[in-house]
Each structure stands twice: as C-alpha cells, then as structure tokens.
Amino acid sequence: SACLVGSEMCIRDSIISLDLVVELNGYMGDSCITVPVGHTNKKNAQLLKVTEEALFAGIKQAVPGNTVGDIGHAVESYVRPYGYDVLRDYVGHGIGIEMHEDPEIPNYGTPGHGPRLEEGMVICIEPMVTMGRADIITLRDGWGVVTADGLPAAHCEHTIVITGNGPRILTLRD
C-alpha cells in the first residue's frame, strides 16, 4: 500500500514525519513525531527509537543556567554512537506568539556555549537524525525534505517550558 504526501508517493515500510503547529489563545505549540508507514524494518525502528531518546537527552539539559550548546551536545552525543548524524540546516527554536522565535536550538553544539537558558523560556527541541549523511534536498513542493543519499531520517519534537523544577513538556502525548 502507499499514501500521497503532497504530490509525492509514500511507500509502505517507509517512515514519515508529521510536524504539527497549533495556536491557542495567541500562543503557538509545535510537536513532531516520525511514524512507520505500515510495518517497519529493524533499522528504521532503531532510528525512530534513538531519535526519540535523543530528544529526551536534550530535554534533560533544558534547565535554567544551561546553554543551548548543552542541549545540542546532548542530542548529537546520543546519536553518534549509532553511526547517525544530525541535520544542521534545521534547528529547534524559541516559540510563543510566533512559531519561530529566538533562541535557535541546534541539534549539535559545545557544552557551555550559546545563549543561556532562563526560567520561563519556552523552546522547541527537535532532533532531526539521519541514518546516513546530513545533506538534504527540498522536494518540488518547496516544503518536503529528504536526505540527499536517500537514507531514512527521523524527526521528533516537543515544546517545553524551562522551569526551576526541571523542563515541563507541553506537548507530551499519551
């Protein structure tokens, strides 16, 4: 079986990312999940699992006093032992009245570098992890993106609030 995404065909046993933004009372929320189309193979299943685990590794670093470099380093350090890479062309971001606000939250970085996280900040952490190289191609629709080497990639995202009691995930799913 297959499904259509825009004008592109989505083939069974592949994976697809669903990135959703919702506005409520003038404020934005952003979340993404990558899911299999039908059943998936072990390699894709591992990619999905590692990407979600990398998201939570980054979220653990989202505390007052840490930096965006701490988050990015946690994400990249988590995926590298699996032979995976992270996209550098797309990053997480602050969010609020606008969907994309400062600061940018890369999925790579140096601990202690970049903007410092403060209590009350609302950010989106969104690892985009590739099984191969991080080079990408934008599809003809101008929106969809695939890896240049044709290997799978996965994307997970949560909107979180930085609090003195640790990160609070606003987009947690059941």
Where do the protein language model's features map onto the residues?
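Charged, cofactor-coupling segments
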Residues: 12-39, 109-174
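A broadly tuned preference for mixed-charge, low-complexity surface segments
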Residues: 9, 64-80, 138-143, 170-174
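Conserved, well-structured core segments that form or line functional sites
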Residues: 23-29, 40-116, 122-134
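Single conserved hydrophobic/aromatic residue that forms the stacking wall/gate
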Residues: 1-6, 11
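Hydrophobic beta-strand core residues of beta-sandwich domains
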Residues: 3, 62-63, 117, 154
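Residues that recognize and position ribonucleotide moieties
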Residues: 2, 69, 88, 153-154
